[in-house]
């Protein structure tokens, strides 16, 4: 979708817009969202960040998904100067002057950190929000040194982008997400986060994210997804936690997945962009406990991802099951 096409949709008399989920756990799903709720979400973010009318805002994500659409809505609602570049892994290469405000996915931030010119521009952004994927411990440690405000976002298409932020830069850096005013969270019987955000979502939303709520009853942190649990021989293993243990030691793209097994119920499978399986086995033996050890290693040309760069877990499970 082009910027002109989206603005035409936005300016149409219809009170709703058709959007699609990212497809990280399966096929992208269509859903209708209310424009007034998108406007409300935009105001909440811009107000929280302290953005001013006329501030520059970088649009570097596809307009097919909610993250890109919301950047345009923020610019319209708050009077920001929108700078559009083609969505790619090196968005900052396309601009000369760093924007005041930018929203990026972790891959774009990572790529910019590897290039001296891009890194310099990244460090001059006044307000940077990062969403659409996990932020590694290594990236978080680097971003802690960023001189301005950098945030990790928590949200989804159903909440019209994010409903909570956690600080990544400076002494205020935290692993806990702080919900916006008017947003309340709780945990259900399955340990999953429930979001009550009436401004942007008409009904309370039960997520698939296994979460922990802080003692203050407001802040929360995410452990992983309910559908990313491997139940192997009666032991529950969280895929994201296993990947986090391995990420500092494996220098090729990889994913942990699972396959059904007649003896254990489910077993751990590692999918990686390498044929050096023995090295992977050595690292796993050193860094994972005995229950977490992969039963199978699969070499692939490329790790399956969605159009927004998230791991395509459903596709990975297909690979794990059929190879």
State where each predicted segment sits.
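Conserved pre-ATP/AMP-binding loop-to-beta segment of ANL
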Residues: 3-20, 53-56
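Gly/Ser/Thr-rich phosphate-binding loop
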Residues: 115-171
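AMP-binding/adenylate-forming core of the ANL superfamily
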Residues: 184-212, 218-219, 273
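AMP-binding/adenylate-forming catalytic core of the ANL superfamily
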Residues: 208-292
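Conserved C-terminal "lid"/linker of ANL adenylate-forming enzymes
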Residues: 257, 269-271, 283-323
């Amino acid at each position: 979708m082009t910027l002109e096409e989206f603005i035409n949709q936005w300016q149409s008399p219809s009170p709703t817009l058709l959007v699609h989920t990212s497809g990280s756990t399966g096929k992208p799903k269509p859903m209708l969202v209310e424009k007034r709720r998108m406007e409300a979400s935009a105001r909440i973010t811009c107000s929280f960040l302290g953005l001013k009318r006329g501030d520059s805002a970088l649009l570097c994500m596809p307009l097919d998904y909610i993250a890109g659409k919301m950047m345009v809505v923020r610019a319209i609602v708050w009077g920001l100067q929108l700078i559009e570049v083609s969505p790619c892994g090196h968005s900052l290469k396309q601009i000369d002057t760093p924007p005041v405000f930018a929203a990026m996915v972790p891959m774009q931030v990572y790529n910019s950190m590897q290039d001296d010119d891009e890194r310099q521009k990244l460090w001059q952004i006044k307000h940077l929000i990062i969403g659409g994927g996990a932020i590694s411990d290594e990236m978080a440690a680097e971003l802690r040194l960023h001189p301005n405000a950098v945030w990790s976002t928590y949200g989804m298409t159903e909440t019209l982008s994010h409903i909570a932020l956690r600080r990544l830069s400076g002494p205020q850096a935290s692993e806990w997400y702080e919900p916006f005013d008017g947003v309340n969270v709780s945990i259900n019987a399955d340990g999953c986060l429930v979001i009550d955000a009436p401004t942007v979502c008409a009904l309370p939303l039960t997520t698939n994210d296994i979460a922990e709520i802080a003692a203050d009853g407001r802040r929360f942190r995410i452990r992983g997804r309910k559908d990313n649990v491997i139940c192997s021989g009666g032991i529950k293993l969280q895929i994201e936690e296993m990947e986090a243990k391995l990420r500092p030691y494996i220098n090729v793209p990889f994913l942990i997945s699972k396959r059904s097994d007649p003896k254990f119920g489910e077993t751990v499978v590692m999918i990686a962009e390498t044929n050096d399986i023995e090295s992977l086995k050595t690292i796993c033996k050193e860094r994972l406990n005995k229950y977490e050890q992969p039963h199978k290693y699969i070499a692939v040309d490329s790790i399956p991802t969605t159009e927004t760069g998230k791991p395509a877990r459903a596709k990975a499970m297909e690979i794990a099951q059929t190879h």
